Amino acid sequence: MMKQLIEDIVKALVDQPDEVQIKEMIGEHAHVLELTVSKADLGKVIGKGGAHASAIRTLMAAASGKEKKRYILEIIEY
């Protein structure tokens, strides 16, 4: 559920949605989502002063409350 939510949000922000990849790693205490986007779209995902990245993380925190799981978003340049 969380992976799909983040993928939908990010694909709406970028110019190259086909380049968006999300890898989920499940740990003992948290789930890590590694978001990979093209270099050209990295700024759009992070936003000015990290505003977009912060907003995405806030949505993740709100959505994860129902699942009782902790999610961490890592943004990686392609």
Language-model segments: residues:
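RNA-contacting regions in translation and RNA-metabolism proteins
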Residues: M1-K44, A53-Y78
